[in-house]
Amino acid sequence: MNDKRKILITCALPYANGYIHLGHLVEYLQADFWARFQNMRGNECVFICADDTHGTPIMVKARELGITPEALIAQSYKEHTQDFADFQVQFSHFGSTNSEENRLLCEYFYKKMQEGNHTRSQPIQQMYCNHDKMFLPDRFVKGTCPKCGAKEQYGDSCDVCASTYSPSDMKDVHCSLCGTAPVMKDSESIFFKLNDFKQYLEEWIPKHCSPEISKKMLEWFNEDLKDLDISRDEPYFGFAIPGTNNKKFFYVWVDAPMGYMSTTEQWAKSQGKTLKDIWQDPSREIYHFIGKDIARFHTIFWPAFLKAAEFRSPNQVFVHGHLMVNGEKMSKSKGTFIAARTYLNHLNPEYLRYYYSTKLSSSVDDIDLNLEDFTNRVNSELVGKITNLGSRGGQMLKKKMDGKMSVPDAEGKKLIEHAQKTAESIAAHYEARDFAKALGEIRGLADDANKYFDEKAPWKTLEADPEGTKQVITTTLNMFRMLAIYLKPVLPFYSQKVAKLLGEKDYVWSDLNTVLTNREINDYEHLATRIEADKVKAMVEEGRKINEEIQAAKKAASTAKPAAAPAPAAAATAGDRPAEIEFADFDKVDLRIGQVIEAEEIKEADKLLRLKIDIGEGQIRQIISGIKAAYKPEQLVGRKVLVCVNLKPRKMKFGMSEGMVLAAGTGGSDLFVLSADDGAQVGQRVK
C-alpha cells in the first residue's frame, strides 16, 4: 500500500502593479512551511502561484511610467520572483495570469457558463467620456472624495482616508485622461447568475472552510445572492470575452483564480501531464491559502465558477489574518509598511521566517510583528538557545579534541529518545498549520539540551575525562541535529548548513530516527548572528523614506491638471534658431524605435544612466544618457524610445556610448524622453 499523499497548494496571486511587502509574506511563508513539511514527510506537494496581471490598475500604473502593461508585468515578475527566492519561498512553478493557458481556460469557463444558462446580459449606466469616446473604468475617473473631501482621488477609493465608494458618489468628477466631465451612458454588461448556486454553496462552505469563516460567509445567504458582473468595457488590460468584438473583457476576479489552474497546467506540462491529470485526480488534495480580506471571492464566487465548468473544488480553503506591526496596522508614515526588498537590504530572511513561525496558527487572527520582540526572540531563541548548542559543541569537538563524535552517555540517550518521541506531536502541529505550537515544542527540546549541556559542563571535564566529555558533546550535537530537522520547514538553508557541518545530506523527516555516533564533523561555520537594533532602525527608516517618495509622487500626480500641455519654452528669436537645412541633410540622421531592455545608474556620475536598448534585428546598443536627474532606471525598462542609431560611437569614461536617446527639455530634472505610440515596432525608422 502506498501511503504517499498527492497534494496541490496555491497562494493568492500577488498583483503585478506593486512590490511584495512583509504583510504579503505572512501568507507565502506559512504556505512554504507547510509545503516543505509535506515534502519532508515523503508526500508529493506541488506549490503553485502566479502574478495577477490584469485590470485597470495595471493600465494606470503602466501609463504613469510611460511603458506598456506587458513591460510593467514583466518588470514585476522579475522583482516578485527574486523577492520570493531570497525569502526561500520554493514554488514548484510561478506563472502569470497573462498566459495563453489562462486565456483558453477563461473562454472554456465562459462557454460552460453559457451552456448552463448561468449568464445574462443587462444594460447598466456607466461614466462615459465624450472627448475620448470611451467608457471610464473607476481608475480613469477622478474627483473629490465623498467621505473626507480630498481632491483628485480615483473613482473607487481614496488614498487619503482609505474609503471605498462609487464614482457617482464623488464631486467634481472628471476623466483622468482629458479632464472633461463624463456623462452617464448605458452599457450592456454580462452577469454570472450566482444565485443559481445558492443551495450548492450553502452546503459546500461548511465542509470546506473553518467554522469561523463559514459563519461569516453564510451571512451573505440571508437573502438572494446578487449576480456578479463578469465583464468590463474597453479600454481594459485583460482577455476579451468571445463574441463581443473585443469590446468587453473578463473582470479580473474571473481570470485571477483561473490562474491557479493555468499555472498548474503549465507545471503539469513540464511533467508530461495535463491539467485534468492533476486537478481532476480524486486522490489529489487541493488547498488554497488566502487572506481573510478575499475570503468571499474564494468561498462563494470561485466554487460557483468551478461548479458551472464541471471542475472539482478545493478540499479546503485555509484563511489567515493580516499583519500588524508594533500592535498597529502597517503604516507608511511610520516606516512599518516594509517592502520585502527593504527588509532584505538589512536583515537575514530566515530571521523573519523564524519569527512568523512562532506567531502563526490555523486561526484567522491577525499576527503582530513587534520589532522589539522580533529582535529579542531571534537573539535569545534562535541564536542563544538553538544555534549556541551547535556552536559550543561543534567548536569544542573540533578545536579542543580530534573532531570525531563518540556515543551518547546514558542520560544523553534518554534525552535523545524523548526528542524522537516528540516527532509525531510536532508533525501533528505542522500538519494542522499550528506552527506556533510546533515551535513551542521545539524550543522546549532546545531548553532540555541546554540544561543538559550546562549541568554536564564539558569545558570543565575536558582534561580529566576526555571520553565522558566527548559523549556529552555527542549527545549535544545529536540534539542540535534533531532541532535542525524539526526546523527545516521553517529554516531550510539553516538546516542545510547543519547537515553540512555533520557531513550529511539534506534532511528528511525519517532522519529523526537516526542517532549519529563515531562521526567526524566538519569545521563549524556561523549559522546565525545576533540582530543589532541599529539594523532594525535602519530598515524602518528606509521604509519610511521610500514611502515618503511614493506618496510625494502620488501627490504630484494627483495635483497635476489632466491633459495640460507643458509650459512652452521661451520663444526663440530668428537669430537663436539653427540655420535651415535641406531634406537630404536631415535624411542622413537615422532615427529608429528602440526599447529599453536594461537601465542602471552610473554611481560615479551625477547625470548619467547606462541603458541597453534593443533597436531591432537582434541589435542591442549601449547608450550612456544624461537623464539621471529626471528618471529612475526602473521607469525606463520596457519603454519604447526614439534613438539616433547612426551617431558616431563615443568612448566615454564609463564605457562606449553607441547612439543617443531623444529627449526634450531644458536639462536636469526638466527632461522628457520622447516615446512612440503603442503601434510602433522596435527597429522601425522614424520618418
Swiss-Prot record:
<dbReference type="InterPro" id="IPR015413">
    <property type="entry name" value="Methionyl/Leucyl_tRNA_Synth"/>
</dbReference>
<dbReference type="InterPro" id="IPR014758">
    <property type="entry name" value="Met-tRNA_synth"/>
</dbReference>
<keyword id="KW-0479">Metal-binding</keyword>
<comment type="subunit">
    <text>Homodimer.</text>
</comment>
<dbReference type="GO" id="GO:0046872">
    <property type="term" value="F:metal ion binding"/>
</dbReference>
<keyword id="KW-0547">Nucleotide-binding</keyword>
<feature type="binding site">
    <location>
        <position position="161"/>
    </location>
    <ligand>
        <name>Zn(2+)</name>
    </ligand>
</feature>
<dbReference type="GO" id="GO:0004825">
    <property type="term" value="F:methionine-tRNA ligase activity"/>
</dbReference>
<keyword id="KW-0862">Zinc</keyword>
<keyword id="KW-0648">Protein biosynthesis</keyword>
<dbReference type="InterPro" id="IPR014729">
    <property type="entry name" value="Rossmann-like_a/b/a_fold"/>
</dbReference>
<keyword id="KW-0694">RNA-binding</keyword>
<dbReference type="InterPro" id="IPR023458">
    <property type="entry name" value="Met-tRNA_ligase_1"/>
</dbReference>
<dbReference type="GO" id="GO:0006431">
    <property type="term" value="P:methionyl-tRNA aminoacylation"/>
</dbReference>
<keyword id="KW-0820">tRNA-binding</keyword>
<feature type="binding site">
    <location>
        <position position="332"/>
    </location>
    <ligand>
        <name>ATP</name>
    </ligand>
</feature>
<comment type="similarity">
    <text>Belongs to the class-I aminoacyl-tRNA synthetase family. MetG type 1 subfamily.</text>
</comment>
<dbReference type="GO" id="GO:0000049">
    <property type="term" value="F:tRNA binding"/>
</dbReference>
<dbReference type="InterPro" id="IPR029038">
    <property type="entry name" value="MetRS_Zn"/>
</dbReference>
<protein>
    <recommendedName>
        <fullName>Methionine--tRNA ligase</fullName>
        <ecNumber>6.1.1.10</ecNumber>
    </recommendedName>
</protein>
<dbReference type="InterPro" id="IPR004495">
    <property type="entry name" value="Met-tRNA-synth_bsu_C"/>
</dbReference>
<keyword id="KW-0436">Ligase</keyword>
<feature type="binding site">
    <location>
        <position position="145"/>
    </location>
    <ligand>
        <name>Zn(2+)</name>
    </ligand>
</feature>
<dbReference type="GO" id="GO:0005829">
    <property type="term" value="C:cytosol"/>
</dbReference>
<feature type="domain" description="tRNA-binding">
    <location>
        <begin position="585"/>
        <end position="687"/>
    </location>
</feature>
<keyword id="KW-0067">ATP-binding</keyword>
<dbReference type="InterPro" id="IPR012340">
    <property type="entry name" value="NA-bd_OB-fold"/>
</dbReference>
<feature type="short sequence motif" description="'HIGH' region">
    <location>
        <begin position="14"/>
        <end position="24"/>
    </location>
</feature>
<feature type="binding site">
    <location>
        <position position="158"/>
    </location>
    <ligand>
        <name>Zn(2+)</name>
    </ligand>
</feature>
<keyword id="KW-0030">Aminoacyl-tRNA synthetase</keyword>
<dbReference type="GO" id="GO:0005524">
    <property type="term" value="F:ATP binding"/>
</dbReference>
<comment type="function">
    <text>Is required not only for elongation of protein synthesis but also for the initiation of all mRNA translation through initiator tRNA(fMet) aminoacylation.</text>
</comment>
<feature type="binding site">
    <location>
        <position position="148"/>
    </location>
    <ligand>
        <name>Zn(2+)</name>
    </ligand>
</feature>
<dbReference type="InterPro" id="IPR001412">
    <property type="entry name" value="aa-tRNA-synth_I_CS"/>
</dbReference>
<dbReference type="InterPro" id="IPR033911">
    <property type="entry name" value="MetRS_core"/>
</dbReference>
<dbReference type="Pfam" id="PF01588">
    <property type="entry name" value="tRNA_bind"/>
</dbReference>
<dbReference type="InterPro" id="IPR009080">
    <property type="entry name" value="tRNAsynth_Ia_anticodon-bd"/>
</dbReference>
<dbReference type="Pfam" id="PF09334">
    <property type="entry name" value="tRNA-synt_1g"/>
</dbReference>
<dbReference type="Pfam" id="PF19303">
    <property type="entry name" value="Anticodon_3"/>
</dbReference>
<keyword id="KW-0963">Cytoplasm</keyword>
<dbReference type="InterPro" id="IPR002547">
    <property type="entry name" value="tRNA-bd_dom"/>
</dbReference>
<feature type="short sequence motif" description="'KMSKS' region">
    <location>
        <begin position="329"/>
        <end position="333"/>
    </location>
</feature>
